Amino acid sequence: MPIKILMPALSPTMKDGNLARWLKKEGDKVNPGEVIAEIETDKATMEVESVDEGILAKIIIPQNSQNVPVNSLIAVLSEEGESTADIDAFIAKNNSVSLSLKTDTTLKKANESITNVEVVKHDLSKIFASPLAKRLAKIRNIRLESVQGSGPHGRIVKQDILSYSPSTAYNRDTEEYRSVPNNNIRQIIAKRLLESKQTVPHFYLSIECNVDKLLDIREDINKSFSEDKLTKISVNDFIILAVAKALQEVPNANASWAEDAIRYYNNVDISVAVAIENGIVTPIIKDANKKNIIELSHEMKILIKKAKDNKLTPVEFQGGGFTISNLGMYGIKNFNAIINTPQSCIMGVGASTKRAIVKNDQIIIATIMDVTLSADHRVIDGAVSAEFLASFKRFIEHPVLMLI
């Protein structure tokens, strides 16, 4: 009897996914445990292994298919002696997804076309211009949507009409561009961050940290290792450990919002934002407060490599109670990050730069790092956030406290 290959559920919350690539073709022999396809989830690309032996008789869902429902039939394995007629009859009886996918895709494209038309009409109805500018435009037969306004908030004023000529009109439709389809990861990022910004009452607190002592200790530790970069401790490793220690001291910052209650977590699991080719992923350091700097650094390097290779497993990126996003390596001084819901906090880390500061009534040069905490005001108040940042600053400026 033919054997079903179903779209797997690679996480508890997964409802559908993209079938990114088939690694086997029709007619190939398949053994148990052999990787046959790659599935793109909301966070990573996962390998799918066959649990049975047979011949890949028919691929139902082609590669690069999007939004394939979990547990839908994606392919069929055949056993020895089964005919093409047997396979076709089996598919006809068991497959109801292929047609629905095509229908959904057609409807989606139609809806997108309608939406695009509506957006254009909506935009044209909201052209702001002064009454005099409108009269002049009508007299001169000038379309207001072709005029770039120079007034407040882009308002078209008299001078814009007087100085307008068709040669100055700017139309982006004539530009050359390349169109990159939004993959599943990018769509999920867009959806989650939009929901976070629209539904979570963000507030922001910033603090400056002197990292001179931290840099000295890091240099001393790294000198004891070989020249292999894989063994070196990074500044970000210290930041993760400092956050873990601060959350241990201020447990009320290690929380998330639920409709029925605020959840305070016993474990200190820290998500760390990692840039990948298709967007961003947040692998998790579990029980970060219980690990020393060497263990934490080693684990983080493994997670970063797996993230960039799209090899993270769901348990390695789902969950977490607090997120760190570090853009300091790009020279960014400070920034306000968007909360990674349902978490209640994300800390944006900026670059460390030499600055003049006052210490003991003397002006000295110190290496200062800016950090900005974005917090969910439903969960955490300003006092708790300030207490957390003060604790974090203490660990960063006195790094020996993290190592004992």
From Swiss-Prot:
What are the annotated GO cellular component locations? pyruvate dehydrogenase complex
**What is this enzyme's EC?**
2.3.1.12
**Which cysteines share a disulfide bond?**
none
Write down the InterPro entries for this protein, in alphabetical order: 2-oxoA_DH_lipoyl-BS, 2-oxoacid_DH_actylTfrase, Biotin_lipoyl, CAT-like_dom_sf, E2/Pdx1, E3-bd_dom_sf, LAT1, PSBD
Which is one GO molecular function term here?
dihydrolipoyllysine-residue acetyltransferase activity
Record GO biological process: pyruvate decarboxylation to acetyl-CoA
Q: How is the cofactor bound?
A: Binds 1 lipoyl cofactor covalently.
Q: Which residues carry this modification: N6-lipoyllysine?
A: K43
Q: Does the keyword Acyltransferase apply?
A: yes
Cofactor dependence: (R)-lipoate
Q: Which residues form the Lipoyl-binding domain?
A: 2-78
Active site (catalytic residues): H377
Check the record and name the Pfam families matching this protein.
Answer: 2-oxoacid_dh, Biotin_lipoyl, E3_binding
Q: Which reaction does it catalyse?
A: N(6)-[(R)-dihydrolipoyl]-L-lysyl-[protein] + acetyl-CoA = N(6)-[(R)-S(8)-acetyldihydrolipoyl]-L-lysyl-[protein] + CoA
Alphabetic keyword roster: Acyltransferase, Lipoyl, Transferase
Please report the stretch or stretches of sequence annotated as the Peripheral subunit-binding (PSBD) domain. Answer: 128-165
Subunit details: Forms a 24-polypeptide structural core with octahedral symmetry.
Identify this protein by name.
Answer: Dihydrolipoyllysine-residue acetyltransferase component of pyruvate dehydrogenase complex
* Natural source organism: Rickettsia typhi (strain ATCC VR-144 / Wilmington)
Q: Which gene encodes it?
A: pdhC
